[in-house]
Amino acid sequence: MTLEERNQQVRAFFNGKIDTYDNVHSEYMKTKVLLAESLDKYAKKILDLGGGTGLELIHLFELFPQAQVTVIDITENMLEKLKTRDFAGRVTTICGDFFEVPFGKDFDAVITTSAFHHFKKDEKIRLLKKILGCLKDGGQFINCDLIALTAEEEAAQLVDLENNIGYSKHVDIPLTIENEIDALEKAGFKQITSGNGGKENYGLFIARKNISHIS
Ligand SMILES: C[S@@+](CC[C@H](N)C(=O)[O-])C[C@H]1O[C@@H](n2cnc3c(N)ncnc32)[C@H](O)[C@@H]1O
């Protein structure tokens, strides 16, 4: 299955989950809140990749009421739900695939949560390079995502992916912390840190484009 086909499978999956998504993900609020809490204080122009129904933006707009947020997401039903939130007027939504849609430029920060564990490492490096290109110098990339706890788990999920052809449900293929960091380094990010992402199997990764601003 190609990356494009897998991304369409992800889209079909989330389009079908819209009635239950927010309830299921209320358990994951800590993983979402960490994004806003990790942002530089001056952050204003923010790109949220895979923002879905906007759960991470609830806390973000409390902390950053002046933020201008762009959300790119492939799943139209998720974005329709986001558009019903009271902060929707402060969000620009773009419905499309990360690998195809132009990101724009000069963002203070790019954030993402629970959205990048659908990509193989080489695909992720490609995406990270695209993110680097849309950040201001010193800008932040913050990713809170599912991780593989061991190299064996990472490898096993890749095997599941290869065996998944023809099935309707997408397969999660999270990387280990070490591979997440290596992907960020290979893409050209600096000042990379990692920590717990609010659940045992979630990692929080923060990295910068070049030099850091005073936050
Ligand atoms: C688990 S949801 C997370 C939504 C939100 N960030 C949250 O934490 O509640 C993953 C989101 O990533 C989006 N997504 C996954 N792969 C994508 C891709 N290739 N391009 C654009 N959006 C994608 C999905 O459509 C979905 O809305």
Language-model features, listed with the residues they occupy:
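A conserved beta-strand element that flanks and buttresses the S-adenosyl-L-methionine
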Residues: I111
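Conserved alpha-helix/loop element of class I SAM-dependent methyltransferases that forms part
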Residues: S26-Y42
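Class I SAM-dependent methyltransferase SAM/SAH-binding core
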Residues: L47-L49, T53-E100
